[in-house]
Amino acid sequence: KTPSDSLALVEIPRRRLDPAKLRRSLVLALDDVQNPGNLGTIVRLADWFGIGDVVCSEATADCFNPKVVQATMGAILRVRVHYCDLEAYLAAERAAGTPIYGTFLEGDDIYRTQLSPTGIVLMGNEGRGVTPACAAQVTRKLFIPPYPAERHATESLNVAMATGIVCAEFRRQASAGR
């Protein structure tokens, strides 16, 4: 592949995670997302859907990996990416009453579920999904149904693709006033 003919020299920001501030917005949480292309695409999706913060487990790919930076197409400069003990963060947010949504194969149909305009959307690892420790903090399990409903040819969606679908539905409902 031909590399981009652009170069940027930027200081890597040191960001402090402020959970109380994030409670007023929609936040993406990533549980051990390993593929740099997926992480970059998710950061780009966050930017597209007006999500300013992505909270990652410590085992998630490095957001400043060159493949991640390239996949963000500049969104890495606008979206704040935080790394922390994700299980502890989710447990504290659950205790604070923050809605925590997670994507699972056995959740509620996302298109038939009323979604909050604020809260945390938890997305899991490419191969294992959401870890049991993080899944225990989820307050609402969501499922993206296949179409038609009886079609089950594909086992699951790529994490970045699923994130795009979930973000679109959250924003659709928020703009519709649901």
For the regions a language model picked out, list residue spans one by one:
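Extended, non-globular alpha-helical segments
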Residues: 1-21
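Short, surface-exposed amphipathic charged segments that create phosphate/polyanion-binding patches used
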Residues: 1-4, 95-99, 158
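Structured adenosyl-cofactor binding patch, chiefly the S-adenosyl-L-methionine
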Residues: 8, 48, 63-74, 132, ...
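RNA substrate-binding interface of SAM-dependent RNA methyltransferases
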Residues: 14-107
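Short clusters of hydrophobic/aromatic residues that line enzyme substrate/ligand-binding pockets
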Residues: 17, 110, 157
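Gly/Ser/Thr-rich beta-alpha loop segments that engage phosphate groups in nucleotides
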Residues: 39-42, 76, 126-131, 162
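Active-site/ligand-binding-proximal alpha/beta "capping" segment
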Residues: 101-154
